[in-house]
């Protein structure tokens, strides 16, 4: 009990010292003492931080914008993660860029963060492998599915990066 209180106090003091009380933090790890957090305005899901950017940008400019925050356009790895991302984009009402592309090798889709493309939610007849359509737009049509579209279109975007792990601090033993 005392250890839990000390950890909570340490977290509160760290946040106050950083002047950043708007961060989203989650206890993780087998000991329950590790803390991961996201910057202010970012939202956490499965150990990653996501940010919806409503600015209408070309895909490459959206990626550059993410990189300025140490992130990439989001990769999506499960239906649950996609549901979370859709909620970030005003419940799926706003078309947005994510980090998938086949611009380098047509028909070979990859994520900008170099993770495997182990989940997709393409709309019917997509991707259609049109050479000028090599970036992924989400929230298309009634099904809110994915479409390969020209990278020069203007859309909002979703960035993602790993959550920051705050090192576990072992409080001094009290004798």
Swiss-Prot record:
Alphabetized UniProt keyword annotations: Antifreeze protein, Disulfide bond, Lectin, Secreted, Signal
Domain C-type lectin: 36-163
Residue ranges listed under propeptide: 17-33
One Pfam short name: Lectin_C
Classification via InterPro entries: AntifreezeII, C-type_lectin-like, C-type_lectin-like/link_sf, C-type_lectin/snaclec_domain, C-type_lectin_CS, CTDL_fold
Signal peptide annotation: 1-16
Compartmental location: Secreted
GO CC field: extracellular region
Disulfide-bond pairs as recorded: 38-49, 66-159, 103-134, 123-145, 135-151
Gene Ontology molecular-function annotations: carbohydrate binding
Biological role stated in the UniProt entry: Antifreeze proteins lower the blood freezing point.
Protein name in the entry: Type-2 ice-structuring protein
């Amino acid at each position: 009990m005392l250890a839990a209180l000390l950890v909570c106090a340490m977290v509160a003091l760290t946040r106050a010292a950083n002047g950043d009380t708007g961060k989203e933090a989650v206890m993780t790890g087998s000991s329950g003492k590790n803390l991961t957090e996201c910057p202010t305005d970012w939202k956490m899901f499965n150990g990653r931080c996501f940010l919806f950017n409503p600015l209408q940008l070309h895909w490459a400019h959206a990626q550059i914008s993410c990189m300025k925050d140490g992130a990439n356009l989001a990769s999506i790895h499960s239906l649950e993660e996609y549901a979370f991302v859709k909620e970030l984009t005003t419940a799926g009402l706003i078309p947005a860029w994510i980090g998938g592309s086949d611009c380098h090798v047509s028909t070979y889709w990859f994520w900008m963060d170099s993770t495997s493309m182990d989940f997709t939610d393409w709309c019917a007849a997509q991707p259609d492998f049109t050479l000028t359509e090599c970036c992924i737009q989400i929230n298309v049509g009634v099904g809110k599915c994915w479409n390969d579209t020209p990278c020069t279109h203007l859309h909002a975007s979703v960035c993602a990066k790993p959550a920051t792990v705050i090192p576990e601090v072992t409080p001094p033993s009290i004798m």
